[in-house]
Design a protein with these regions (language model features):
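Alpha-helical transmembrane segments of multi-pass membrane proteins
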Residues: 1-228
Length: 228
């Protein structure tokens, strides 16, 4: 049950990251339909690349590899929106800014594509042929993410606080991978605990950023208006 809850939340976080990027691109470059279409298209294609990459390069431990993926997703997702505003405020031309934003979409998509096979592998250690249940929970989590983003996160918090909030949630899930440490080999636990400490540090930083999210949002808005 705990693993299914983690699957749900991870899918929720990943789709919200992409929607945040789609909305940010719309704010900077206009043409909302185009931005969202390209964002979702790149996301789906990148998920496929992530799954294929994982097939080519199997890790010794799926739990260990998943912890690395969650750390990267937390960093990329949490910093994506603010990073775009900062680069724009620094005077980065439109084309490089657009390339960077779409690169983030691809990176988050690849990492998300790696999540699903790793989660299936972890689940299969307890019960065979559980792919359908993992995929089902993953899809429902993504659907929930689209609804919560559209009807609550974005209208209530805006872009920057939403990014911090979702990445904080992602970091919490990364910490909860501690519940799966029994599936680690004896030689892998040291590295896992090191990664867990890094995840805890990220969690603390994100909590601080969320606390100061309103001030950071105002700074981003000033940068945006100043460059317009």
């Amino acid at each position: 049950l705990i693993l299914y809850a983690l699957i749900f939340v991870l899918a929720f976080c990943s789709i919200v990251y992409e929607l945040l990027l789609g909305q940010t691109l719309s704010a900077f470059f206009g043409n909302t339909v185009l931005r969202y279409s390209v964002t979702i298209g790149l996301y789906m294609a990148s998920m496929g690349l992530g799954a294929l990459y994982l097939q080519w390069r199997r890790a010794r431990s799926s739990v260990l590899r998943l912890q690395v993926v969650e750390i990267l997703l937390t960093v990329c997702g949490g910093g994506s929106v603010v990073g775009i505003f900062l680069l724009d405020g620094a005077g980065l031309p439109t084309l490089p800014l657009s390339i960077w934003a779409h690169f983030l979409i691809i990176v988050i998509g690849v990492l998300t594509g790696m999540e699903i096979p790793l989660l299936i592998e972890i689940r299969n250690r307890d019960r065979r042929s559980s792919e359908t249940s993992v995929l089902g929970v993953d899809y429902i989590g993504a659907f929930a993410g689209t609804l919560v983003f559209a009807f609550y996160f974005y209208p209530t918090f805006g872009l920057v606080p939403s990014a911090f909030l979702v990445s904080l949630l992602n970091a919490v899930v990364g910490m909860l991978l501690l519940t799966q440490r029994g599936k680690l080999g004896s030689g892998e636990r040291g590295r896992f605990h090191t990664l867990l400490a890094g995840q805890a540090l990220l969690l603390a930083v994100l909590a601080l950023l969320l606390w100061r999210a309103d001030a950071i949002s105002e700074m981003c808005l000033s940068l945006y208006l100043g460059s317009s």
